[in-house]
Amino acid sequence: MKVTTIFIIGLLLPLLGTMIGSAFVFMMKNEMSARLQKSLLGFASGVMVAASVWSLLIPAMEMKANSGAWSVVPAAVGFLLGIGFLLLIDELTPHLHIGTDKPEGLRSHLSKTAMLALAVTIHNLPEGMAVGVVFAGAENGAAHISLAAAISVSLGIAIQNIPEGAIISMPMRAAGNSRWKSFMLGSLSGVVEPIGALAVILLASLLMPALPYMLAFAAGAMFYVVVEELIPEASSGQHSNLSTIGFAIGFVLMMVLDVVMG
C-alpha cells in the first residue's frame, strides 16, 4: 500500500470511529444507561492519557535526549502551553456540555444544539492535533516516530471515538431528534479531527525544529480535556467504579498499541 494512501487512511480513521459510535442510535432503542456511559467515559479517558504519555510526551523528550537533563524542557513548556491554549478556548467559546443546562464560556444567544456542537469541537480538536503531529513527525523522518507509531495513535483515537460518538448521538436522540439527525450531528462532531490534523501537518512541516514542543502541546491539550471534562463526568454520581475500570482498560489498550505497532 502506498504511503500516501496510508496517510489518508490514518487521518480519516478517527472520523470513522466517531461515525461508528454515532450509528449506535440505529441499534439501541433507549437512552444509554448510566453504567455504560460511565464505562465509556473512563475508557476514552484512559486512551487519551496513554496516547499523551506514550505517543507524545515520551517521544518529545527522546527527540531531545542529546540535551541531557534539559530534554524535559520542550516537553514541559509544550505541555503547559497546550493546557493554556485549551483553557483560553474554553473560557472564550460559548459551549454546553452534554447532560448539563448551564452554558460555559462567553455569554451568547446561540441555540443549545450550536453550543453542544462547540463543546464537542473543543473536545475533538486536541485529538486531531495529536494525530496530525505524529503523522507530521513520521512524514519528515523524525527520530522515535515511525509511520507504524502514527497509525497506532490514529487507531487508538478511532477506537476511543466509538464510545464518544455514541455518547454524543444517544442523548440527542433521547432529546427528541430523529435517528438520522442524531447520527449526522454525532458524525459531524468528528469532522474537526482530520481538519485539525491536516492543519498541524502543514504547520509542522514548516517548523520541524519545534516538533518536540508541538508533540507536548497536543499532549497538554488532550490532558486538559480529560481533566476538565471526561473525568468529572465519569466520577460524578453512582457507578464511578465502572469508569475506573474503563480507564484502566483504555490505558492498557493504547499502551499495547503503541508498543506493539511503534
Question: For each predicted feature, which ranges?
Answer:
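Intrinsically disordered, metal-sensing/regulatory segments
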Residues: M1-G262
